[in-house]
């Protein structure tokens, strides 16, 4: 067993690499194990050669007693250690009788004791290794005697069995080596073979195995499959093994009776058996070899090959083969054309597999055929559904040099009976991607032979007047009727010439014709052009003037897009036409074919092109025309004066954005510039709108494209502008917000739309900013407004929006805050946050009024409808605030009346009068002014209390005097009042006590912190602007801030009272709370407040003008002035501590006023009355 194992190990080693794991090693481990088991079993069963022979005889094999699998093993002969001379003689006789027995080259190798004395050779043979001339190789055939069973083995295994016989005195013992036809390497004995590391691979299968069936070689012509190799070169590759095997078999093999032919490549040996049955293709086997070799070596044709004739392909001598292959190539769906050509299955090898080639030669013509399917398709031999359509280069390949008549016939047969050659089809198709303009002019990435696929559009100087055959790039396959007259023999000398003749040299695009001849119905176009070859494409202009009727300038512009090859490969043919201008930033292409209109939208899948193309060109034209007109109408819908811009169809708004996001920025900027005239903006985008196939197709990716929101916002802006400052109109704030937020078809842009509309009202088309998210939160909406800079352009970039927001004054934030309530279900929550933030900012800045940074605040131009506002604030921010405040949701004058009545009663009461020289409350100029300013006429002006007070940054008030304020702080709220500063320090104690009382009353009276403030602000907005005195009074609110901070701690228990007083003092309170201690006012709301809004508020507060104007002036004086007015009114009225939110400014204001030293004792008594405190007030406060 050990010896057998060692022999098997050596036998399994590869002859070349001496590796057992090599694929060309003698055998598999599994086979080896099976063989060993079988050998052991048989060895012990037979016990000798005499017993083994009958078992191995052919008779036994035929009986099925042997193991056929074991005969496949290469080391079966290693088991035979002895053979008698009888066996050897019988073998000789068998070989002499066999007509196919191999001749013996020599018999020089002596054999002793049945074993060869040849020394072992290295595992891998070298150049200098002795050849088989020293030994004889025999392919043994089954001998007549039963002792020779290996022919039967050969029959079963199809393995050439060779025996090595050497002449000598001793009887020769033929050692059958079943090494898959491999030579024995002069190892005459199995023992030597197995002991040496040079053992041939036992499992090496011959490429051309010898097949014998019971003494009869089969097939008889098998010798044709055995090429003769005499090369002594070493082949390291796996094929080398086979080659070497063949080389060593060939010298002694008689199977090859014909004289050795010139060396044939290995590929031919592998493929020739397949070609045996295909003699009709090309009788010459060498041609077959060359053909397959070319296909093997050149799997894909180069670009030049795709465009120009192939010298290699011209080697084919059989024109019928090429013709049939071309026909098969052209019409794969019609098998009748190539059923008689058995070579067609191999025809595909002639065509390139390069993706670029496939696209240019196959995909484009296929699309063209699909799109240009002629109504008379039944007449044409070229089916439109053919996945492998014809191409010009293919026609030239048939015989590019001279046999063009045949090509012409073939083209006429396969394409149309209208003399439209096959080569015309891909070129005549609309939006042909391969444009044969001057080489080198094409965009980078295109083959040298191929011109810019969109060179027609990219290069305007390309037109050649010498060839007006091609009116438009979007002609269907039947549109080139004039080309049919071209003689293919004359014009097909070169592919470039052919294309030029087909009309690519001149295009209406290049010629800048006002309207290119888009692809009309194929039947109509072909018929028309038969009589009138289109010279300039103007023949079909009437059909497509609908595209031009829109009056958009893009129609007259010549496209200048330069597309690279990769663009159109994944998109329909005409898509680049529709989107080229978009990508380049130009409005659209001059010649926008209907196909482009339908398919150009990127939202449409590329698969849609073949689908709709199948519908038929005429139907496409009709539908496309209708669609175009429909989109033309839709395009101007949202620019119309309709009251509801959100009712505008989605397609006009979103479609253009989806089609091209690259062009959105310039277009949005243009939109921002054209804020006054939205129609201009819309008219500048007609091609994009037209390209949008349908709202349904566009609606899906609405949230995907951030550009879409700006577009929608732009639409809103345009509508609002047409409404003549919709915000400035008489609509209440709530109605406005609801109107803006009213669910639109898009729905996604609802929250952005109000922002866009509001900004548009200020000649800003914030929607132009392409950086907006699809559905920004209310905070983002606020940022949207804030980011909007003053001026016509909307240069709001994603980063700029944040930066500008921080820089912008409260006036910018006003619209956002105003929309906070509308956007959020809780109107007062957001406004409270804003107001509280404002108050805190103001408080943090100290008693001095915050200074506004003039450069930072973005001025919002006053709309014509805002003339009502009498804002004294010079800054545009105040104006913006006034604009926002124009639409009061709740009339604040109702509150003002109640307050007025109460104040009058208090003034009349004896308690109201204070001892000393204190002026009565009514006598106070500030009070009077506030009462007057709070007239109902001014109430309508203030729309958005939130936005006005916290957001708007008022301009610098001309007169701002500091007055001593009484800080009466309600719990959790800062009561900012713009009253004169207190002169005596002793008033602090009184203020603290009063603040407590006021807080108690405020808690009782204030209904709800959030709503109270909103209402108060609204009321304040409705009130007229206060006089300068009011401004002076309000300007001193910062002094109150310090007092309020101290009083805030004390007045936590007065929440109930503050609530009671809330309504009465609401008008003035929001401003007071904001101005006194913004830091303390409504911190909970502040926490929920968006961070950016807080920043904005902080800046607004930092500016004293904004804070003052917001409080005093509702509209006329600006948001700063409205808060002041509110403060004055609140002070004059019953001061009540404001509890949690500045939005209930009345209570805060009252409390703050009571805490701060009022300008008159009457005012202090009024506060005392509300607080229930009856104490002498300090001396008269300084004016």
UniProtKB/Swiss-Prot annotation:
Q: In which tissues is it expressed?
A: Expressed in kidney and testis. Expressed at lower levels in stomach, intestine, epididymis and ovary. Expressed at very low levels in heart and spleen.
For the null mutant, the annotation states: No visible phenotype. No effect on testis size, testis-to-body weight ratio, germ cell development or spermiogenesis. No effect on sperm morphology, count or motility. No effect on levels of germ cell apoptosis, chromosome H1t histone association or acrosome biogenesis.
Please note every region of biased composition (Basic and acidic residues): 124-134, 487-509
Q: Where is the composition biased (Pro residues)?
A: 847-858
**Signal peptide interval:** none
Residue ranges under compositional bias (Polar residues)? 135-153, 671-685, 975-984, 1069-1079
Q: Where is this region: Disordered?
A: 109-153, 469-555, 661-686, 843-884, 973-1032, 1048-1087
Cross-referenced InterPro entries? Spata31g1-like
The protein here is known as: Spermatogenesis-associated protein 31G1
Name of the gene: Spata31g1
